[in-house]
Amino acid sequence: MVTQGNIRGGQHGVTLIELLVGALVAAIVIAAGFAVLTSSSKALTTNEQTIETQQNVRVAMEFLFQDIRQAGFGMNGPVGNCSTAIVPADNTTAGPDRGPDRISLVAPVGNPMGTATDPAWVLANDTSIGSGLPLALSSALAVTNMASEAGGSLTAPNATISIGGAITTTVTAAGGANLTVPTVLNPTTMKQNTPIYLLQCITYQIIPPPDPTGLCAGRSPCLVRGVAGGITAGVLDCTTPGSRCTSIADEIEDIQFAYGCDGCVAAVNSGTPDGIIDSQPLSAAGFDQADFVTNNAWATAPLTADKIRLAQVTIVGRQRRADQGFGESNRQTVQGTALQVSDHLHSDGVFAAGDFATVTPPYTSTRRRLLTRTIELRNLRH
């Protein structure tokens, strides 16, 4: 006869060894899953940062390409603080740089197509420019928007405008949909819907940490673009009061410019521009990299800024945060060697002389992307 006691006596429980083995297997499975999840998350973060860095560099280059290519559009004299189409500002004109370069240039701002909320900046009818009659635009809102783009006023100071890229003049009065320009001896008639462009002196500048003026909105270093309000140490500066500069690309660490010029070497074609980039004294025969000038103030004839015909732009962007790697460590070396960008060796100073060791995050812990492009100034061709 089978009793309840016999049944209980015939049952065997889990031994301590079996329990420990089961716990160990479970721990291994959980640890493996955690490792896969952690490494996947870190790999995804690294990939996202890399993509963001590449996008920032491309955006910065696209802005510069458009403005440099159009530099000098409709220009027949100084515009704002730009005395020439291109105003170079090398970090150190006497030797290797210890920080990013800057550039200022004359660029057109226009709105030839228009929208319902931003009417086109075009002539409302056939107009005799310089006859003493005002220029009638498509609407008063177009004049208001143009004044806003100019900093709030078209007359204080007098804004420079280009009508169809053919006639450049200044605004002496603005009211309603009308602009008044100076009278000239021989007025020129322009057709209805001819676009009107506002010419501005635009500055490109990198704002390093800690960004006391807040231009980078917490994402310094960044590249800013706009009308600088004043001059610091002899160059236009977007951090001065009254500046109208905004960030166009985050985490841009360096920007370097080198220029090709025509008519800037007295020994080449007697210093007369001939449509060919001058061969610099230390370069080989023909056009090569040595014909791009990096260290110069462009203020002593014949090497002056009005002779610039090509600009070689190099932009360096960096990741915002350091990668963690696949373990739990927060530090790894991904940039083992300091970059040499044109005449700027980063180990001598990234933003200023001697700051290489104090850059945050550490220089060696962040990836960088470098992009170089050569741009022709099409409005300065001969």
Model-derived features: where do they sit?
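N-terminal pilin/flagellin-like segments and related low-complexity appendage regions
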Residues: 57-314, 320-367, 376, 381-382
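Aliphatic-rich helix starts adjacent to a transmembrane/signal segment
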Residues: 2-65, 69-73, 369, 381-382
